Amino acid sequence: MNEVLNAIKSRRTIRKFKPDSISEEKIKAILEAGRWAPSFSNLQPWKFIVIKDQKIKKELDKVAKETVLHLGINEAPAVICVCVDRRIDPLHAIESGASAAQNMALAGHSLGLGVGWIGTFGTDAEKGIQKLLQLPETTRVIALLPVGIADESPKGSRKPVEEFIQFR
């Protein structure tokens, strides 16, 4: 099977991490994958914040508790906060940020790391994260991506393709 399709099909959201650190080289490779995500008119409205400080991660975990799947923030050696500046692209920034987050999740997986995905957009947690990280109101927080060495291997499942695809 094609490497990209294999990565897409085998990637899982990870919520449990080993305490081992990860290299700066791998973090930079993940960020580089986000940088190459598609964006409307190539506006690239994103900003990526890498959080390693345990104190900040603890606060981030408290703020993110509103989201159902906030697990992994404290345990992961790094958390990437994916943001977009809606002044740059008010209509498509969210899609661009989600594309960048997906690229980073796939890149982390391809590098042998586990990556979580905590959706924060439009929640009270988003406002708390903006405040904690001192982000301007024009910056939207799309997702938090805890990154590290996975301490779990969740099984994946999907609906049959016939349930949601139409050809006309």
Where are these regions (language model features)?
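Acidic, surface-exposed loops and disordered segments
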Residues: 1-168
